[in-house]
Regions:
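Small/polar-residue-rich segments within soluble enzyme cores
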Residues: 326-328
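Bacterial N-terminal signal peptides that target proteins for export
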Residues: 5-18
Length: 328
């Protein structure tokens, strides 16, 4: 729902360390090892642990394990819950990777990143004068890839889950957070205010993610449309209008209905039927490129892990198209 805060954080690492699995996702921005001092930090847990950017999402994963689930069950429950409670770090409109090692020693790397729509073309991010357009590349409907998260998480559950839980049981946490509301954390509150100007461009987003649509906001929108103020001044003034606070409740009934369709119909609840129609209609109305055929054809891909060495340790990571290769 809003752009990543990687530029401000510099490095973002999500680590899920459980008795029979180690999954880590490392994003670009890492500094050379020589820039860091060595720290010996040892954390032990006999039964497992879950770490994510959302306490609620992590608790969903922990609860699954307490009920007898394995680490992969916990990954899927946490992943879907993140789509509701921390959408800048996990969402069903995007994609991701999984790097995992089972207790049998098998190293798994699964690619479920977004894919370019069939209708993509070489000059789609160039403006009328033939110059690269940041807005077209980052903010337009043309920049949307075919989402892979739903297929990826379901693939993980099917191939490596314990078999003790149905998809509907795994999704029940995310559905509850969306339908009945959840308290947002400090990071989400900041993001909702920081990207207020983008949410205001869409009626659906405005309804949910703008806490109070004030006369001042309306006037600022009119001013930028009329050319009275430059765009950057408009953005800065919108960002200065703090509305959201840690602990504020967000309820997303439509989001819950989308998750229920996935819960009831699996992949077909997202890549076909009503949800697919909503996605394609949105694309058609706004010069987007994703088609029904793109959605139907999406499949996650198991890839060979890449191997590197660090201070005598063998490090296995995700290969292209991730940044795991350059990292190693």
């Amino acid at each position: 729902y809003f752009e990543s805060l990687e530029n401000q954080i510099g490095e973002k690492i999500i680590l899920l360390n459980i008795a029979d699995l180690l999954i880590s996702i490392s994003l670009i921005g890492c500094k050379p090892g020589s820039d860091y001092s060595s720290t010996n930090l040892k954390i032990e847990n006999r039964n497992g642990a879950v770490s994510s950017t959302s306490r609620l999402a992590s608790e969903a994963g922990v609860d699954i394990m307490k009920k007898g689930g394995n680490a992969f069950d916990a990954i899927v429950a946490t992943g879907f819950a993140l789509a509701v409670t921390s959408p800048s770090n996990g969402n069903i409109g995007g994609g991701g990777f999984m790097v995992a090692r089972t207790n049998q020693g098998e190293v798994i790397t699964l690619d479920f990143r977004e894919k370019a729509p069939t209708l993509s073309y070489e000059t789609m991010f160039l403006d009328d004068e033939g110059n690269y357009s940041r807005n077209l590349a980052l903010l337009s409907h043309k920049s949307s890839g075919v989402p892979g998260t739903v297929d990826g998480l379901i693939t993980i559950l099917e191939d490596y889950g314990s078999g003790k839980f149905s998809l509907s049981e795994i999704l029940s946490y995310a559905i509850n957070f969306a339908e009945n509301g959840h308290g947002i954390n400090k990071s989400s509150a900041f993001g909702l205010d920081f990207y207020k100007h983008l949410f205001l461009e869409d009626k659906g987003s405005t309804k949910i993610f703008i806490k109070d649509y004030t006369l001042e906001m309306k006037q600022l929108q009119q001013d930028v449309l009329n050319g009275t103020i430059p765009e950057q001044e408009y953005i800065d003034k919108m960002r200065s209008l703090d509305q959201w606070n840690e602990g504020d409740i967000i309820i997303q009934k439509d989001w819950a209905e989308t998750l229920k369709r996935i819960s009831e119909n699996g992949r077909d609840g997202f890549y076909s039927g009503k949800t697919a129609n909503l996605i394609v209609n949105e694309m058609r109305a706004n010069n987007g490129l994703i088609s029904h055929e793109d959605l139907k054809q999406y499949r996650s891909i198991y890839r060979e892990p890449i191997l590197g060495n660090y201070r005598g340790y063998k490090v296995r990571s995700m290969g292209p198209p991730s940044s795991g290769g350059p990292l190693i």
